[in-house]
Amino acid sequence: ERSEVEAIFYSKKYEDTLTKIKYNQNNKLKHLISFDNLENTDGIYSLNELIKTGEKLIKNGNKEFIEAKIDNEKMSIMLFTSGTTSSSKVVALSHKNICSNLMDIASVVDVNENDTLLSILPIHHVFECTVGFLFSLYKGAKTVFSDGLRHVVDNLKEYQVTVMACVPVIYERIFGMIRKQLEKQGKLDNILKKEEELRNSSMEERKENFKQIHDMLGGKVKLFISGAASLDPAIEERYRLLGINIVQGYGLTETSPVVAIGTNKEHKIGSIGKTVPSVKAKLVDINKEGVGELVVKGPSIALGYYNNEKATKESFKGDWFYTGDLAKIDKEGYIFICGRKKSVIVLKNGKNIFPEEMENLVNKIEGVTESFIFGKQQSDDKNDIKINVKVVYDKEVVENVYKAKTKEDIYRAIFEKIKEVNSTMPQYKAIRGMILTTKPLIKTTTNKIKRQANLDEINKSEN
């Protein structure tokens, strides 16, 4: 209803749902096109038949498709945001938005017709659509589609992949797999020693020395791009010490999406790199630590939020888009993301807590698969907040590593590790309470934590 869509292409599993929707008076849906049906049926077109009809029209000299005039400033795609802290908004992007971003990426990322890109994330997500799919077409490279998250390493080998753009959790899993194999082979200590010896050497030299590890990934990888969430700087550094070129990129649906990206020549650990050529960035409302909200402008910035004037006015001010992300920018122009403005926890003493930063530390605890940092009100004073964490753990790993069997033993073992995390931070940041579960956190399709949904679930269970 919100998109006012008139036609939908769909696969068989959605047929019953879409048939019901079509006859709902609250929408403008006119056409259903099935990927699976071989023939047109009552009220439903077959994609197969539409292609045949189109071929006939072209043979008969029809040039409507080729001669169609495109207004590159008008909306050509609408995308629903993931809504990690609130309900989703409909982002309106134009041809100009997408194409300018493609050209920006192409000018800084070294990909050519000899490359093979592995597509993993859903293509309805703008990061995968632009970086993992359209960018490949634009550069004449080949795109291969993954068999699923569990098969990424196999796919890297099978398809001799050279470039992959994905989310941090995949790179963390791959790194964990490499480490386990080296431990099993009794080679880990030697590898770690050699990493330090080669710390000041070139990426090529490291690649030659760690050929065995590169072969685990197919032997052809020249670039890993991490996006959609923050990559743990420690993981990023370890990849690069092994001669694996991994960089971080940053963007949002509203920016088509790439705002900034690191390259092999211009790169700093923990940074999302510098802005792409046609995008400008600055900080507003900067605090004493040099952290402010990142605002950006350029031809890839969205037209606004479809049918939502209020939200558009809040985020799009003049030429600038207010990202809602807090960041630092150093003297050389490298951008460092600190966290989401809406997810920052403000304590009674006025100090700011960035949940993402603390979650990275908790996630390093052996047996912890993911975590969610939140503020818990301690009294009637709504500003009296203490830091708590919801920890998702791997039962088998925890039982083996900590020799803990009962819930009480598991809680005690993990909270001892939480105390170790606390000892590395100022006292005001200390985690005071913990919830344990084996149930995964609520996340978006690109593995971002849906903060409000998880907080609602915690509040519901406590009430």
What label would you give each PLM region?
Residues 144-146, 224, 231-292, 301-303, ...:
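Conserved ATP-binding loop and adjacent catalytic segment of the adenylate-forming AMP-binding
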Residues 275, 282-284, 288-347, 352-355:
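Conserved ATP-binding/catalytic segment of the ANL
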Residues 34, 52-80, 87, 110-116:
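Conserved pre-ATP/AMP-binding loop-to-beta segment of ANL
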